């Protein structure tokens, strides 16, 4: 039997849920208004992937900050060491899935945000050399 989603936040214009969380993998669901920055530039020691369900997400990926905008059905996998940031694009809300493999503490970090508790997890500032290039990322504009 599949686990039930762990709803962390649900308001009129935003939502966040943990769908799967174990050491090997976490999958989270998010919904945010359009035109909103979600994260600034950072790197992980693990892979992070995004699948757009609705709306658009705008990414900056790699040492050069290559801009990529993906609509519904779009997918990007960002390998370990590749700098990235993203947000919702346009004026429409967006819904998407985020996959961390391995989890790297992301699910605990999300729970900590809700509880107002700082939780350390696998995230770091972009290194001085900018990290690895965007060519390492896997981008599928639409499935």
Name every feature range the model reports, one short phrase each.
Residues 1-28, 33, 39-40, 114-143:
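A short, N-terminal "cap"/entry segment at the start of jelly-roll beta-barrel domains
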């Amino acid at each position: 039997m599949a686990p039930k989603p762990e709803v962390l936040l649900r308001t009129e214009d935003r939502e966040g849920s943990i769908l799967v969380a174990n050491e090997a993998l976490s999958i989270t669901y998010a919904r945010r208004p359009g035109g909103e920055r979600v994260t600034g530039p950072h790197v992980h020691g693990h892979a992070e992937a995004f699948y757009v369900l609705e709306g658009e997400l705008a990414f900056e990926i790699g040492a050069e900050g290559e801009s990529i905008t993906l609509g519904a059905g779009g997918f990007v996998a960002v390998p370990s060491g590749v700098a990235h940031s993203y947000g919702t694009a346009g004026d429409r809300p967006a819904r998407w899935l985020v996959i961390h493999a391995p989890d790297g503490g992301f699910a605990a970090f999300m729970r900590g945000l809700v509880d107002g508790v700082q939780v350390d997890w696998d995230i770091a500032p972009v290194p001085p050399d900018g990290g690895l290039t965007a060519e390492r990322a896997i981008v599928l504009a639409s499935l």
